[in-house]
Amino acid sequence: MQLTPNKFTLKQLFSSSNEQFVVPGYQRRYAWGKKQQKALFDDIDLLKEDDNHLFGMILCHTGAHTGGLNQSEVVDGQQRLTTIALLLLAMRNKFKAIEMNKKVEEIEGLIHCTDREENILQKITLGELDNPDYKRIFEDSTEEEVVNLNLLNGYHFFSDRLNEFEKEELLSFYNKLINVAVIIRLDASFARDAYKLFESINNRGLRLSPTDLIKNFILGHASKIDQNTLDQVKELWSSVIINLDRIDTNQFLRQYMCMVLGKRVTMDKLVEIFKHYYVNNVKDTDLISSAELYTEEVEFKDEEDENGYTNSEDEDQDELEASEDIAIKTKISIVEFLKGVKEASLIYKKIRLREFDEPKINQKLLNLQRILSFPSYIFLLSLFQREISMKDKLSVLRLIEVLMLRRHICQKRTGELDDIFSQLVSVEDENIVNLVKDRLKEDLPSDEEFEDYFPHHIFKGKLIDRARYVLEQIEYYLINDKGEYRLSSAKEVHLEHIIPQVISTKKAQKEFGDWVTYLGNNAVIKHKKYVSRIGNLTLLSGELNIKASNNPFNCKKDNYKKSNLKLNSSLANHYRQFKFQQVEERGYELTKIASKIWRF
């Protein structure tokens, strides 16, 4: 292993006019936020001129030195290096603003490099996703077009902090930044050495994400095969990262493995299970050492996804054995394997962003998102790779919609859902609708249970969108819609609380009327129990909502009568008053309808 560790000041690190640091496309986007940016800035600011401060380390894969442009691939440390670049850009523009032109020229020399033809280039280039944004900031051009706000916000944070300095403070900070603080640079001549070092170095520092560990494992294996394979693997992994832009790659890989194995995989076990499955199914894995297969016991924090799910329950299953049981008859190449991952990532993107060509599919996916059906994506990854009819796909999505709504309403354990949808992957294409229905029936709450829970279900917080979905579906049922009618967006049609959400404050009484007196004894206590139930909710246009919110129920009725929705006409015509008893009555009426809508 040929390694060259060196300690540099930033001035020394960026001194070579023909070296360019390249953050490869397979790396994730720039992700540092204000917390990390502030820590870096404060570390420099608090330094004394005779102190030493270690920025950290960067790991580079370097080729043979030439007389032209030498590109060093940043294998590790891209977040820190990019942050330093943003700080230098902010300093350049600050010096420019106060007309310290020599300092401007000095920084220009640090942030630029030249090729053999003397073309002036960026000293640091980012991956395909981030470099257009970085270039806009670098060239001080249109900020409105910047997509990655971490880059833009970082630049503005540094600019704001620098603007607080007097001239002498600014010069002192600049000197400490480029001449006092140091960074360790570790160069590896061979790609296999760089990827091997990457994981071992980070095991002693900040914990890597499962995506980082899996990426490094795959690149390390590819580097041991040949350069052509490594180049193809880098390109394929870059495509995966691009496909999953703004999507949690850790969750994609976890759900992908659930689909492949047909069993639940937790985030804690993801890397280990992936490695074992990979070794059993990909060619040339005899090149991988046992040390590379070993995954240090690290407890990955089970962060909630946007739908509120975690995957930390039921840890007693032997997931590792499952990965060893699933092995294809003939091993495939690493390139073929990654082509499969790339295809799955594209489908996952279409699922998450609702980007299929068929609008009806996208509408069903929106319904699932509003219900909060994240675990179902395990099976949907499989479903959308199947050669089955559009009609069958829509029918299967409808079955999942019914299952998820009923289970949520009946407060069934979410920890069971990964198992349910992982096992569903094994159903055959032929007669798929009936097969899925038969499987899901086992986990579907009964009519009796659903009707017992539905009128008392609390729709608030993250569940507001679920309430809107439920009321929309009831409205479609009431008008006997055949899929041709769609309510306006949430911006135009809002969720309306018939009894207002707040009734006891002076502001609420002034704005909404004296609901406390109107509702009678124990109004405030009962209000908390009833206000977020389905019986107290309806849909109303923005204009009507504003008017209605300023009136007691009798005045609200006048506005409900003006609404084109069946929900509101029945509400206005059926109820002379609307108190807690009426919330219960209406809840039971809507329950009867719901039981007919959400059934197999």
Model regions and ranges:
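Glycine- and hydrophobic-rich flexible loops that cap the catalytic core of alpha/beta enzyme folds
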Residues: 2-284, 550-599
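Active-site-adjacent bridging/hinge elements
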Residues: 11-18, 51-68, 167-175, 344-358, ...
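Short, amphipathic alpha-helical segments that act as regulatory/interfacial helices
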Residues: 41, 85-88, 198, 377-384, ...
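Betabetaalpha-Me/HNH-type nuclease active-site subdomain
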Residues: 42-70, 426-568
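Short helix-capping/linker segments at secondary-structure and domain boundaries
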Residues: 94-98, 205, 224, 385-393, ...
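Generic hydrophobic alpha-helical scaffold/packing signal
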Residues: 198, 381, 397, 401, ...
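A cross-family structural signal marking well-folded subdomains
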Residues: 211-214, 221-475, 597-599
